[in-house]
Design a protein with these regions (language model features):
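N-terminal secretory signal peptides and thylakoid transit peptides that target proteins
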Residues: 1-11
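Conserved redox-cofactor binding core of oxidoreductases
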Residues: 41, 46-49, 161-264, 270, ...
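Beta1/beta-strand and adjacent pyrophosphate-binding region of the FAD-binding site
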Residues: 73-87
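Glycine-rich FAD pyrophosphate-binding loop
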Residues: 99-116
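Rossmann-like flavin
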Residues: 134-196, 440, 444-459, 465
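Glycine-rich loop(s) and the adjacent beta-strand/alpha-helix scaffold that form part
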Residues: 260-263, 267-343
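An anion/pyrophosphate-binding glycine-rich loop and adjacent beta-alpha core
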Residues: 318, 322, 328-451
């Protein structure tokens, strides 16, 4: 029989919401350097402790740099609204504000608009109506998620997001279509409470750009912003916020530096400053403070910040906006730790973002969980397994067995209109994966155990026990849904 394997190492991407950046202008203060050895480059687990200064916990990134002197500012830009960041959040803000009559300046440390990923959710949209997809009822799902978070969430924001999602998505659909983009529906899981679809952008039709077409969407927004007269400035990095009355009044502007020569620009906002500049996953000290569980995955070495990067599993941006907010007295969210964007492996799953729902074993050759979960959930449990590795094991008749249970096979990123995969297509895909090392194939459990470095005798016992439970129709070990 053909046994195939996937390496289900949980891959971690960006953490929490955020901004851009590395060390602020003028370098770190002596106090900051003394506060944390992480300022010298690498951070390790022994550094991940709170530093107490003036009776409060402080990390070095919480300590503000010296203000940029007025005589070093070579240019001043004034407008109604200043938007910091040229991604989806920044450009949707700029376009929406300009449509309502505001004069807007958007500046970004990147050299062009940039975004990544995809999978845009809305409860309903004109595209869904065109395809006959029923609106999503979030109540069971939202309640489940809130309970899982011990209700440490802002319910007003959650429900506002739901209630206004249709209007917002239709707005974006119009902008995308105006620029020549197609808006298609991407399949998601059907076995859990979440929505089983998401909106994606494409220039190819079907699934060619599903989950990667967000760059096309942000470029469409840039074109719309230009038509509306938004002033757009690239290669300019935010350094410090300007807050009146000794950090007790309103935020009135931003000090930024030009990437080309380091000269300083003051952006003055008559109405508001909007921070929309990315995440903080490339500041390892911030990860240690707010999202420590991902540090072993992304590594402890402090990486260089590339504002033009599309994706990087070891961290993207450096949290400049969050730092600037902290320096002028902004509050951090109370829910802790911050939610990382993590994803387990999809090998052997019939769901687009599912996990292999058959037998899973860890490096100790033990079955370690109920397998009927989504890939993101599986990655959390993998973090507690030896080596952060697990193996899904199945036989060549597994595709047909799933079909016999009334399910269908869909892979990640498939357009809603595409037909399900056939067993022959799946086996061919897995065989191709064997050639690249993504899967392992064996005729016996002994051979499989040898390839994977598992205990052959224990693997036979685990498989026998799993088959016994399958025959009973009841998972007496982990109570998985049969």
């Amino acid at each position: 029989r053909d046994f195939l394997k996937f390496g289900a190492v949980g891959a971690a991407g960006a953490a929490a919401a955020g901004i851009v950046g590395c060390t602020p202008s003028g370098g770190a203060t002596d106090e900051a350097k003394a506060a944390s050895p992480a300022m010298d480059g690498a951070i390790n687990s022994s550094d991940a402790v709170l530093k107490l200064t003036d009776g409060m916990p402080k990390w070095s990134f919480m300590i503000p740099p010296e203000p940029v002197p007025d005589d070093q500012i070579t240019e001043t830009v004034e407008n109604d609204i200043i938007v910091v960041g040229g991604g989806m959040s920044g450009f949707t803000t700029a376009v929406s504000a300009a449509e309502q009559g505001a004069k807007v300046t958007l500046f970004s440390a990147a050299s062009a608009p940039i975004s990544r990923g995809g999978s845009n959710y809305a409860k309903n949209s004109k595209v869904m109506e065109e395809l006959g997809i029923e609106p999503f009822d979030p109540v069971p799902f939202y309640y489940h998620e809130m309970r899982a978070a011990s209700f440490a969430v802002d319910q007003q924001k959650w429900m506002r997001g739901y209630n206004e999602s249709e209007e917002a998505m239709n707005w974006m659909i119009d902008i995308a279509r105006e620029s020549g983009l197609q808006v298609i529906m991407e399949r998601d899981n059907t076995f859990d409470l979440g929505p089983n679809y998401a909106h994606a952008f494409s220039t190819e039709g079907n699934s060619a750009m599903v989950s990667t077409g967000q760059q096309g969407a942000v470029e469409a927004l840039e074109a719309k912003a230009q038509k509306l007269g938004v002033e757009i400035i690239y290669d300019t990095k935010a350094e410090q916020l300007i807050r009146e009355d000794d950090n007790k009044g309103r935020v009135t502007g931003v000090i930024a530096s030009k990437m080309a020569d380091g000269s300083y620009v003051k952006f003055v906002a008559k109405q508001a400053v909007v921070l929309a500049t990315g995440d903080f996953s490339n500041d390892k000290e911030m990860l240690a403070a707010y999202c420590p569980m991902v540090l072993p995955l992304v590594g402890y070495e402090q990486g260089e910040i590339d504002y033009n990067t599309s994706f990087n599993l070891t961290g993207i941006y450096g949290g400049d906006g969050q730092k600037m907010g902290l320096w002028v007295g902004a509050a951090w969210q109370h829910a802790y730790p911050n939610a990382p964007m993590m994803q387990g492996a999809w090998g052997g799953s019939h769901e687009p973002c599912g996990f292999h729902m058959g037998l899973n074993v860890n490096m100790n050759t033990e079955r370690y969980q109920r397998e009927d979960i989504s890939a993101p959930y599986s990655s959390n449990h993998l973090l507690s397994q030896p080596g952060n590795v697990a193996y899904g094991i199945w036989t060549a008749n597994y595709p047909q067995a799933i079909l016999d249970k009334g399910h269908e096979w869909y892979s990640f990123g498939m357009d809603y209109t595409l037909p399900p995969l056939t067993p022959d297509e799946l086996v061919a895909m897995w065989d191709a994966g064997v050639e690249t090392g993504a899967y392992f194939k064996a005729d016996t459990l002994d051979d499989l155990a040898k390839q994977l470095g598992l205990d052959a005798a224990k693997l036979k016992e685990v498989v026998a026990r799993y088959n016994e439970l399958c025959d009973k129709g009841v998972d007496e070990d982990f109570y998985k849904n049969p």
